[in-house]
Curated annotation (Swiss-Prot):
Protein name per the record: Peroxisomal membrane protein PEX3
Summary of the knockout phenotype: Leads to a peroxisomal-deficient phenotype and mislocalization in the cytosol of peroxisomal matrix proteins. Affects the assembly of the peroxisomal translocation complex and impairs the interaction between the peroxisomal docking complex and the peroxisomal translocation complex.
Lineage: Eukaryota, Fungi, Dikarya, Ascomycota, Saccharomycotina
GO biological process, alphabetically ordered: protein import into peroxisome membrane
Gene field: PEX3
Expression triggers: Expression is induced in the presence of oleic acid or methanol.
Biased composition (Polar residues): 113-125
Compartmental location: Peroxisome membrane
Amino acid sequence: MLEYTAGLIRRNKKKFLISSGIIGVGYYVTKTINNKIQEFQNRIREENFAKEQIKRRFHQTQSDCYMTFLSLLPVLCEPIMDDLPVETITKQLQIRRLEKQIGNKDVKNSGSTVLSDDFSTSQEGAISEDTNKPPELKSKNQLWQELKIKAITRFLTLIYCESLLIVFLHLQLNILSRKSYLETAIRLASETQGIDLVDQESNGDFSGNTQDENLSEQAFLSFSWWLLNKGWLEIKNKIEPCVEQHFGGINPRQQLKINEFAELLNKCQNCIDLKVLNLTEEDIHLGVGVIEDQSQPVGRKSTNFITNALLPPKEFEFFLLQQTNDLDFLSRFNNNIVNTESLNMLLDELNNYLNNADINLIVNKLATLGITKVLDEIVLNLLQKNRPNPISDMNIRDIDLNDFPPYKLAALLANITKQSISLTNNSVENPILADLNNLPELNDLSASVYSNFDP
């Protein structure tokens, strides 16, 4: 039997060798293919996981942007409300009206809070003034003129400053979030796969301690101080002449239809867009703007107004850090030149974004949306008084405003004042602010910043 088997092998040796080779090659190929498939599946899972991580962190960053905006809103609004004291002027008009009604008897000791027909009790509680200091004596007409200009100026200043703050924070936090994610991903790849990768944004410097890196990021976040304390005044000074131009000649007792009032606000906005955003009506219609020369010299000086309103000149940067941080922070920050270099890189990138024409268009869309939402609320408030059935904001677009009677400008100013106060409400449930934060173009901007991994 053994001889027969040995003879069979000798006679078919070549066939056995070929068969064994085929089986061996087949096994190797099959194993290789299986390994490649396994690697491909693992890579797909890793990519999907990475995409989910990026998506999750992106959405978390947008939520952080909104919560940061709400936390800074009182800081932004307080000086604007103080600089444009509409309620104080209203108080003086109330006193004048009361003096006339009761024959100027014991008015100063009455402490009355009676309001005129044109201003509702919604303004109570917003007045903060020194009662021991007598108000400046002005005629009733002067007070009404001042009230008219300040009420509309304050409303538009709040809208534009809040729009700028939203954009500024979305740029800041998405730059930092992308930077943090990229550094984490590179560090993990280096540790788990032994790959020597260089993060071009940090010049491959992973030897510096995390604490120092956090110092530059903290300093970067401090730069919102400029808009909150300086920039808003620049915005207000651009807005007030536009309001004077289009509302200055209108008597507060003059009657206007709602669409006429909206048209006046639109003219003011066009004037503001030209002065603040350097946008004409044609630019807005075409969706284009003036692109700032981004090859800026050292110092980041810019002729773009909103950039100058949002970022300080180079020589004031350390002053800003002094205003926003304690001495211990400043000492630790200055001890390492890398902190200054890292901060400058972040500011340069932010400056480049702010000088892009798309930013001006987004600010315009935010302001337009805010003004539109406020006008919708005013329409609802006015129409609810004259209609027994409630009107929702869902069917307000079906209403023909030409069918409704005109209102005194004073009544419209009262509603503008009421809505201005609502713009200072930093509740998460504030519908107007939520709509601003959910503007699609703002989300697109955030996505483009977050996904920009170019050096």
